[in-house]
Amino acid sequence: VGFKAGVKEYKLTYYTPDYETKDTDILAAFRVTPQPGVPPEEAGAAVAAESSTGTWTTVWTDGLTSLDRYKGRCYHIEPVAGEENQFIAYVAYPLDLFEEGSVTNMFTSIVGNVFGFKALRALRLEDLRIPVAYVKTFQGPPHGIQVERDKLNKYGRPLLGCTIKPKLGLSAKNYGRAVYECLRGGLDFTKDDENVNSQPFMRWRDRFLFCAEAIYKSQAETGEIKGHYLNATAGTCEEMMKRAVFARELGVPIVMHDYLTGGFTANTSLAHYCRDNGLLLHIHRAMHAVIDRQKNHGIHFRVLAKALRMSGGDHIHSGTVVGKLEGERDITLGFVDLLRDDFIEKDRSRGIYFTQDWVSLPGVLPVASGGIHVWHMPALTEIFGDDSVLQFGGGTLGHPWGNAPGAVANRVALEACVQARNEGRDLAREGNEIIREACKWSPELAAACE
């Protein structure tokens, strides 16, 4: 027999500290918490093995392939500052292990099996470096930031949105009315809630019809292009595509998808359809916290955001930064840049473990949504800049005078902040004053500020 059977240490094969990473490798940074007594090198090597070619023993078919060409390699390990028994293990995967243009296959390979591994107490995927050669096999976002601005004819400011509430229970006609009021007041977009699909109280086709009516009516009144994120998420891919086709037939500008609950395969199909048919695609991240909330186990949202840019979407929810802890701000802005920019430098203070080159893959607009209102507008304008969508749900619909005045208040606040910024004023310091000044000209804003 040419080999010894039996259990062997992973680090003999898969821990290669002198490996020079290739430009075509997919690189991963894992936060590893080994079980007591397991050395970090063994834990890191185990991750590399289990997420690539390895199994727990030598098998005779190993002789039929070139392990050196196909194995994942743990090439560097560093302790995590301030945590005991946590390490960052860097793993390099040869590109040949992955199917072209498939986020699904990339995740199945890298995170499919290894998270249940006994030698690890916990494991978190912190970041991925996607090589240019692999990026080029993806279509990416259907349109991207610049094309979206051209389609909507809106420049030099963030876009404004609003989720229609109450999210469940309205009839289609009343729902359409709420959409119309918001758009008429000055918002660019309104949004289906992520769990509005096609329930007994409001079937999807009725909702699409009444929302389209609201869009056309408000466009005629305001002279601006309007949109409503029609949620096409469904129980089957076929049904999802049927909804997207109907949206296209109505001539509306944008549809929406829940990419984690719907799955990457469905999302990529929808993104391809959207590019072929001129629809923008808004992405909601329902279920993300199940995956990304634990600090020591799961997948960091920046990886899910990168995956979405590859799979395809023109907007994605990315948190608000406002009112959160300071440390969160840098981390959030780190993955906001990963969504928007062509080239992002490695910067550990912002949680970016690798330099990422997206070559010419279109960018994604980050969406700030959840618990924000007009007083946050100066901070949001400063933090997110022009290329973003700011969504005020309760902040619009909670206005004492109704939806349209609520929309007016948000639009006035936004225009005031953009104008102040363009005049060189400091939004962080003078924010409240800027909003108060604008209140003098807008009774709607004044009412919202009380």
Curated annotation (Swiss-Prot):
One GO cellular component, as annotated: chloroplast
MF-aspect GO terms: magnesium ion binding; monooxygenase activity; ribulose-bisphosphate carboxylase activity
Residues modified to N6,N6,N6-trimethyllysine: 4
Subcellular location: Plastid, Chloroplast
EC number, as in UniProt: 4.1.1.39
Amino acids binding substrate: 113, 163, 167, 285, 317, 369
Active site: residue positions: 165, 284
Marked site (Transition state stabilizer) residue numbers: 324
Cofactor binding mode and count: Binds 1 Mg(2+) ion per subunit.
Tree of life domain: Eukaryota
Subunit record text: Heterohexadecamer of 8 large chains and 8 small chains; disulfide-linked. The disulfide link is formed within the large subunit homodimers.
Family of the protein in this entry: Belongs to the RuBisCO large chain family. Type I subfamily.
PANTHER family: RIBULOSE BISPHOSPHATE CARBOXYLASE, RIBULOSE BISPHOSPHATE CARBOXYLASE LARGE CHAIN
Stated role: RuBisCO catalyzes two reactions: the carboxylation of D-ribulose 1,5-bisphosphate, the primary event in carbon dioxide fixation, as well as the oxidative fragmentation of the pentose substrate in the photorespiration process. Both reactions occur simultaneously and in competition at the same active site.
Protein name, per record: Ribulose bisphosphate carboxylase large chain
Native source organism of the sequence: Sedum rubrotinctum
Organismal lineage: Eukaryota, Viridiplantae, Streptophyta, Embryophyta, Tracheophyta
